[in-house]
From Swiss-Prot:
This is Succinate--CoA ligase [ADP-forming] subunit beta. GO terms for biological process: succinyl-CoA metabolic process; tricarboxylic acid cycle. Pathway: Carbohydrate metabolism; tricarboxylic acid cycle; succinate from succinyl-CoA (ligase route): step 1/1. ATP binds at K50, G57, R58, G59, V106, E116. InterPro entries: ATP-grasp (IPR011761), ATP-grasp_succ-CoA_synth-type (IPR013650), ATP_grasp_subdomain_1 (IPR013815), SUCC_ACL_C (IPR005811), Succ_CoA_ligase-like_bsu (IPR005809), Succinyl-CoA_synth-like (IPR016102). The gene is sucC. The keyword Magnesium applies. Binds 1 Mg(2+) ion per subunit. Succinyl-CoA synthetase functions in the citric acid cycle (TCA), coupling the hydrolysis of succinyl-CoA to the synthesis of either ATP or GTP and thus represents the only step of substrate-level phosphorylation in the TCA. The beta subunit provides nucleotide specificity of the enzyme and binds the substrate succinate, while the binding sites for coenzyme A and phosphate are found in the alpha subunit. SUPFAM superfamilies: Glutathione synthetase ATP-binding domain-like, Succinyl-CoA synthetase domains. It is an enzyme of class 6 (ligase). Residues 9-253 form the ATP-grasp domain. Its cofactor is Mg(2+). It catalyses: succinate + ATP + CoA = succinyl-CoA + ADP + phosphate; GTP + succinate + CoA = succinyl-CoA + GDP + phosphate.
């Protein structure tokens, strides 16, 4: 579950991480009031207006701007709220901005130069261990750093049996080139950041940039946070942070009815039981020269009602030109699934206007094929994996 920057900063602050202070606003009037409050509390006279969407790269998309007075706060907020923000991490349509964060200006002059770093904590799925990824090249262009100078990005793996050790935090601070008070501040920052990551059951905490201020303080200027969905049952206070408006509406609807659905950009809808078979089916579609429109795992109870619900979910995507149903009958019987497909097709009537290709293997697969072939419905059946792909290709080539 992704959350907004301001929510991520709230979590960080609760674990003792120094953050760039800010107040969220839903409209320009609230934005001006937030700026006035910040001036009272922090003394700042310049402000940063930051679009709150679940995507990185907001600065490049025009979603982060500096305001030097209250009038500019109002004007910039009016520009950003309601805009379709397009960044390297959004679709071509972008994301609509519903709120902004009015933050204090922390790039003030002082005895030393400011520096920006990149630090994230996440799970290394290859080793099964948490790790801290860090770089001296923090800021908007971290993607460019990763692509062209990957040697500037380092990582520190954490042994789960002992957790983050003090020497590891010191090593990171040393590798970032810090000394004196800034070194001590960074060690404390890393320790608190890791505690926030563990304590909130997060799957990622990305801070970009981490700022060394001109008076050698270390603070989080941004926060991109993902909370593990599977841990929300024990993190109810974070579950309330979900912003449905930021999520794909089809995915939200699918989740409400218990379907595991992920929207993609292709034209071939997929209805499969089991995540592994679903991914293999998507690969097959790509090998056939097409792109999958979704990942959809119907699970082990593919009755008529569930199949019909899955059909309706898939067809909400206007880009879908064909649907491939690929079911392996282990516990679930193939004939039951086939009857569900036929019944769903009858119930939906003219709602289904795209070719349907069904491949059923496993328990009662022969009976299932007969059911489909004798149904009188314009449903194509296949036995082999490649045969199903060929039928998809033939259907879309007409």
């Amino acid at each position: 579950m992704n959350i907004h920057e301001y929510q991520g900063k709230e979590i960080l602050a609760s674990y003792g991480v120094r953050i760039q202070r800010g107040i969220v606003a839903n409209n320009p009037v609230e934005a001006v009031a937030a700026a006035k409050q910040l001036t009272t509390e922090t003394g700042t006279s310049w402000y940063v207006v930051k679009a709150q969407v679940h995507a990185g790269g907001r600065g490049k998309g025009g979603g982060v701007k500096l305001a030097k007075n209250l009038q500019q706060v109002e004007e910039i907020s009016e520009q950003i709220i309601g805009m379709q923000l397009i960044t390297p991490q959004t679709s071509a349509e972008g994301k609509k901005v519903h709120k902004v964060l009015i933050a204090e200006d922390v790039y003030y002059p002082g005895e030393s130069e400011t520096s920006e770093f990149y630090i994230s904590v996440l799970l290394n799925r290859s080793t099964g261990r948490n790790m801290i990824v860090y770089s001296t090249e923090g800021g908007m262009d971290i993607e460019e750093v990763a692509a062209h100078t990957p040697h500037l990005i380092h990582n520190e793996e954490i042994d789960p049996s002992v957790g983050l050790q003090a020497f590891q935090a010191r090593r990171i601070a040393f590798n970032l080139g810090l000394s004196g008070n800034a070194f001590k501040e960074m060690v404390k920052f890393i320790d608190s950041l890791y505690n926030a990551y563990i304590g909130s059951d997060a799957s990622m905490f990305e801070i970009n940039p981490v700022l060394k201020t001109s008076d050698d303080k270390i603070m989080a200027v941004d926060a991109k946070v993902n909370i593990d969905d599977n841990a929300l049952y024990r993190q109810p206070k974070y579950a309330d942070m979900r912003d449905i408006r930021e999520e794909n509406p089809i995915e939200v609807e699918a989740k409400e009815v218990g379907l595991n659905y992920v929207d993609l950009d292709g034209t071939v809808g997929c209805m499969v039981n089991g995540a592994g078979l679903a991914m293999a089916t998507m690969d097959l579609i790509k090998y056939a020269g097409f792109e999958p429109a979704n990942f959809l795992d119907v699970g082990g109870t593919a009755d008529a009602k569930r199949v019909e619900t899955a059909f309706r979910i898939i067809l909400k995507d206007e880009n879908v030109k064909a649907i491939l149903i690929n079911i392996f009958g282990g516990i679930v019987r193939c004939d039951r699934v086939a009857q569900g497909v036929v019944d769903a097709y009858k119930n939906m009537g003219d709602a289904i206007k795209v070719p349907i290709i069904v491949r059923l293997q496993g328990t009662n697969a022969e009976i299932a094929k007969e059911l489909i072939d004798n149904s009188g419905m314009p449903i194509l059946s296949a036995v082999q994996f490649q045969e199903a792909a060929d039928q998809v290709k033939a259907a879309l080539s007409k």
